[in-house]
């Protein structure tokens, strides 16, 4: 695990557009601040039971949390009665998630994975995979995105579902950044905004009330592009929600949530 609190993006941070760099971005100092950014109580109130209901109405019981972070969704799903395996590419995040789970009376089953080789490190099949917190946008090239979606598809049962979210990068690219931060980033005294945006990079700055500052470099995925990749990998039916609502104007949501079903559907 990293033992540093300092991020390193080199001389020109906007040139860091590498899928493998994200593990270096989640240094101990940033991970320690993450729960200030993701206020658990506020986030639970903002989300309501959206994910729990989406899973329950499909009869899902065995869930892979593919982007565990500090454990918010893993713990919520465990408390709702689901069988959860908690995965992440960051050892620092998994350690924090395990600690958070233990504080709430749960022992998380954690596994460090690289999504591109997911099925090498996890075992069995799942009724659902969740990939939340804008995590999919850490993948900077299409080959990695296709491989990851294929790995997710393979890890699902025949009637399984993938729930994947992303920032509304369409709105940021086309209209600039304007967010009330009413979803996902709910912590008080935390400022989150893009320092640099172009078609190949969204560099977000995270400012905390103690004066500390961190950054994440991510790829600005457009909504319809993500949906197309899902279809091409094999997902049959994809519903996209804007800030947990089925009806929305494309420019309005902070986040999109894609609910992609694997179940094969014959054409009429």
Swiss-Prot record:
It comes from the Bacteria. S-adenosyl-L-methionine binds at residues 26, 34, 43, 67, 88, 114-115, 132. GO terms for cellular component: cytosol. Substrate binds at residues 134, 167, 206. The keyword S-adenosyl-L-methionine applies. Optimum pH is around 7.4 and 7.9 for glycine and sarcosine, respectively. It is an enzyme of class 2 (transferase). It catalyses: glycine + 2 S-adenosyl-L-methionine = N,N-dimethylglycine + 2 S-adenosyl-L-homocysteine + 2 H(+); glycine + S-adenosyl-L-methionine = sarcosine + S-adenosyl-L-homocysteine + H(+); sarcosine + S-adenosyl-L-methionine = N,N-dimethylglycine + S-adenosyl-L-homocysteine + H(+). GO terms for biological process: glycine betaine biosynthetic process from glycine; methylation; one-carbon metabolic process; protein homotetramerization; regulation of gluconeogenesis; S-adenosylhomocysteine metabolic process; S-adenosylmethionine metabolic process; sarcosine metabolic process. Pathway: Amine and polyamine biosynthesis; betaine biosynthesis via glycine pathway; betaine from glycine: step 1/3; Amine and polyamine biosynthesis; betaine biosynthesis via glycine pathway; betaine from glycine: step 2/3. p-chloromercuribenzoic acid inhibits more than 95% of the GSMT activities on glycine and sarcosine, and S-adenosylhomocysteine (AdoHcy) inhibits completely GSMT activities. One of its GO terms (molecular function) is glycine binding. Belongs to the class I-like SAM-binding methyltransferase superfamily. Glycine N-methyltransferase family. PANTHER family: GLYCINE N-METHYLTRANSFERASE (PTHR16458:SF2). Monomer. Catalyzes the methylation of glycine and sarcosine to sarcosine and dimethylglycine, respectively, with S-adenosylmethionine (AdoMet) acting as the methyl donor. It has strict specificity for glycine and sarcosine as the methyl group acceptors. This is Glycine/sarcosine N-methyltransferase.
């Amino acid at each position: 695990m990293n033992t540093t609190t300092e991020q390193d993006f080199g001389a020109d941070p906007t040139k860091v557009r590498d899928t493998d760099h994200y593990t270096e971005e989640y240094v101990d100092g940033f991970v320690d601040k993450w729960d200030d950014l993701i206020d658990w109580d506020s986030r639970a109130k903002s989300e309501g039971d959206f994910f729990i209901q989406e899973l329950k109405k499909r009869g899902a019981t065995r869930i892979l949390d593919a982007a565990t972070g500090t454990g918010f969704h893993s713990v919520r799903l465990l408390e709702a009665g689901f069988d959860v395996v908690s995965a992440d590419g960051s050892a620092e995040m998994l350690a924090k998630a395990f600690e958070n789970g233990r504080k709430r009376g749960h022992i998380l089953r954690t596994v460090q994975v690289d999504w591109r080789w997911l099925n090498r490190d996890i075992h069995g099949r799942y009724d659902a995979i969740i990939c939340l917190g804008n995590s999919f946008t850490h993948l900077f090239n299409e080959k990695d995105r296709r491989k990851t979606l294929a790995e997710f598809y393979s890890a699902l049962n025949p009637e399984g579902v993938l729930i994947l979210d992303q920032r509304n990068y369409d709105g940021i690219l086309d209209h600039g950044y304007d967010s009330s931060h009413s979803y996902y980033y709910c912590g008080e005294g935390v400022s989150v905004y893009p320092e640099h945006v172009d078609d190949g990079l969204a560099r977000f700055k995270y400012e905390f009330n103690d004066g500390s500052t961190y950054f994440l470099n991510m790829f600005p995925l457009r909504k319809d592009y993500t949906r197309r990749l899902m279809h091409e990998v094999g997902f049959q039916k994809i519903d996209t929600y804007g800030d947990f609502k089925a009806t929305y104007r494309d420019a309005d949501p902070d986040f999109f949530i894609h609910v992609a079903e694997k179940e094969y559907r014959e054409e009429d």
